[in-house]
């Protein structure tokens, strides 16, 4: 198979559901060898098996790795196993994240710490591990952080979540400065309202869905596949001079003030 990512090895955290899954599928279709991290559970293992069956090209182009991304050692393990399997890593997509809607006055320390550890701390250590390997290889690379429109605006029921996504955006900007001298590009994608498990309950409510769609100039909520295209662009050589950028993928939601 040939494509925009032919010959590249890509690792994705949180890659068996939602946005991560869509990115994994489309990157494989564009010729990449794909390493997919997922939570160590029976359900996620089954999803990983199904994903592998869907995108495998018969040439052993997919590796799935269970692991809790909130643990610093998980990022290192993903990179180590990716290199052991495919010899190198060229693209790293930090996607794993959680978002349970909560009233600010009722958020417990446990909920906050879990959200920060998964969404931000885990991303930091995984990105660091990927960058260390890319520097060792001496061939540059591309690191993509999946942030959110929530990095730019507030959310009454997301006070534990929005700071982590703002943190991802800031992390990608700072790593762009820190790693540019090694030829490693770091960029953020900021999805708007995307139909995933994170907002499944909200989108089941006809009134809430109508309200959400009414605020989006394109008139629909996004599909996970809508994020895959921008991710492929940032992973590919077409974006060789794109570094420290934030790519808002929201159907026009952010700019619609009326």
Swiss-Prot record:
EC number: 1.1.1.173
Catalysed transformations (reactions): L-rhamnofuranose + NAD(+) = L-rhamnono-1,4-lactone + NADH + H(+)
Residues of the active site: 147, 161, 165
UniProt-listed GO biological process terms: fatty acid biosynthetic process; rhamnose catabolic process
Remaining remarks: Part of gene cluster that contains the genes for this rhamnose catabolic pathway.
Cited NCBIfam families: PRK07231.1
Name used for this protein in its record: L-rhamnose-1-dehydrogenase
């Amino acid at each position: 198979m040939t494509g925009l990512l032919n010959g590249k090895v890509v690792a994705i955290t949180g890659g068996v559901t939602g946005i991560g899954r869509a990115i994994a599928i489309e990157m494989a279709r564009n010729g990449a060898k794909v390493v997919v991290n997922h939570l160590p559970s029976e359900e996620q293992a089954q999803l990983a098996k199904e994903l592998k069956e869907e995108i495998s090209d018969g040439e052993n182009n997919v590796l799935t790795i269970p692991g809790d991304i909130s643990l610093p050692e998980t990022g290192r393990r993903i990179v180590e196993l990716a290199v052991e399997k495919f010899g190198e890593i060229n693209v790293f997509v930090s996607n794993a994240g959680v978002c349970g809607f909560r009233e600010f006055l009722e958020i417990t320390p446990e909920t906050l710490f879990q959200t920060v550890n998964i969404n931000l701390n885990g991303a930091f250590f995984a990105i660091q591990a990927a960058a260390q390997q890319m520097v060792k290889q001496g061939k540059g690379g591309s690191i993509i952080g999946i942030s959110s429109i929530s990095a730019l605006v507030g959310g009454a029921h997301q006070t534990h979540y929005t700071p982590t996504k703002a943190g991802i955006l800031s992390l990608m900007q700072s790593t762009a400065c820190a790693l540019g001298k090694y030829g490693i590009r770091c960029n953020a994608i900021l999805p708007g309202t995307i139909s995933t498990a994170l907002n499944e309950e909200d989108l089941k409510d006809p009134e809430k869905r109508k309200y959400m769609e009414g605020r989006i100039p394109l008139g629909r909520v996004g599909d996970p596949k809508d994020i895959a295209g921008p991710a492929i662009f940032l992973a590919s050589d077409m974006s060789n001079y794109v570094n420290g950028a934030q790519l808002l993928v929201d159907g026009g939601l952010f700019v619609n003030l009326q």
